[in-house]
Amino acid sequence: EVDMRCKSSKECLVKCKQATGRPNGKCMNRKCKCYPR
């Protein structure tokens, strides 16, 4: 999980790619969830 606020899952794709190296993630409860870990 990335502690970043989001409005859409598209915002998380960039953040997840930075965090995990893969642009896989969803915006849930206004926070980004990245997977797989």
From Swiss-Prot:
In this chain's numbering, which residues are marked as the site (Basic residue of the functional dyad)? 26
Tissue-by-tissue expression:
Expressed by the venom gland.
Give a GO molecular function annotation for the protein: potassium channel regulator activity
The record's annotation in SUPFAM superfamilies points to:
Scorpion toxin-like
List, alphabetically, the GO terms of the cellular component aspect: extracellular region
UniProt superkingdom: Eukaryota
Supply the Gene3D superfamilies for this chain: Knottin, scorpion toxin-like
Report disulfide bridges, numbered on this chain. Answer: 6-27, 12-32, 16-34
Could you list this entry's UniProt keywords, alphabetically sorted.
Disulfide bond, Ion channel impairing toxin, Neurotoxin, Potassium channel impairing toxin, Secreted, Toxin, Voltage-gated potassium channel impairing toxin
Q: Where does the protein end up?
A: Secreted
Q: What is known of its domains?
A: Has the structural arrangement of an alpha-helix connected to antiparallel beta-sheets by disulfide bonds (CS-alpha/beta).
Assigned protein family: Belongs to the short scorpion toxin superfamily. Potassium channel inhibitor family. Alpha-KTx 01 subfamily.
Other remarks in the entry:
Negative results: does not inhibit ERG1/Kv11.1/KCNH2 potassium channels.
Q: What is this protein called?
A: Potassium channel toxin alpha-KTx 1.10
Q: Which organism is it from?
A: Parabuthus transvaalicus
